[in-house]
Amino acid sequence: MPTINQLIRKPRKDKPKRNKVPALQACPQRRGVCTRVYTTTPKKPNSALRKVAKVRLTNGHEVVSYIPGEGHNLQEHSVVLIRGGRVKDLPGVRYHILRGVLDTQGVKDRKQRRSKYGAKRPK
């Protein structure tokens, strides 16, 4: 442990804050083109086939992003908008695709939390 005099001579250094979504480059969202749409399995205690897409962004980055909701219409060459936000049980997936924007359709027959899934108000 340093003495007070040592701390006066050379103060403690702050740890640099790590950027959790580097591909967005401080933007709220980014547009990109799907290069591959596939399913993957989650980490140990969970079991499912999670839908993900590899997306090439307009800034040149290529990222893996999660497709939320039940069912989707995405395929290769679909233009999508991505936002930050990781999926805890999928390692390497740090972005979400926004539903109901550009080529991505909203979730069909969604009644609650519709704004998160790009679903229109039911009649």
Curated annotation (Swiss-Prot):
GO terms, biological process: translation
The UniProt record lists the keyword Magnesium: no
One Pfam family hit: Ribosom_S12_S23
Coiled-coil stretches: none
Compositionally biased region (Basic residues): 9-20
Annotated S-S bridges: none
Modified residues (3-methylthioaspartic acid): 89
Region (Disordered) location: 1-21
Sample GO molecular function, one term: tRNA binding
Gene Ontology CC annotations of this record: small ribosomal subunit
Alphabetized UniProt keyword annotations: Methylation, Ribonucleoprotein, Ribosomal protein, RNA-binding, rRNA-binding, tRNA-binding
NCBIfam families xrefs: rpsL_bact
The protein's role, per its UniProt record: With S4 and S5 plays an important role in translational accuracy. Interacts with and stabilizes bases of the 16S rRNA that are involved in tRNA selection in the A site and with the mRNA backbone. Located at the interface of the 30S and 50S subunits, it traverses the body of the 30S subunit contacting proteins on the other side and probably holding the rRNA structure together. The combined cluster of proteins S8, S12 and S17 appears to hold together the shoulder and platform of the 30S subunit.
Family stated for the protein in its record: Belongs to the universal ribosomal protein uS12 family.
Quaternary assembly: Part of the 30S ribosomal subunit. Contacts proteins S8 and S17. May interact with IF1 in the 30S initiation complex.
Record's protein name: Small ribosomal subunit protein uS12
Species of origin: Maricaulis maris (strain MCS10)
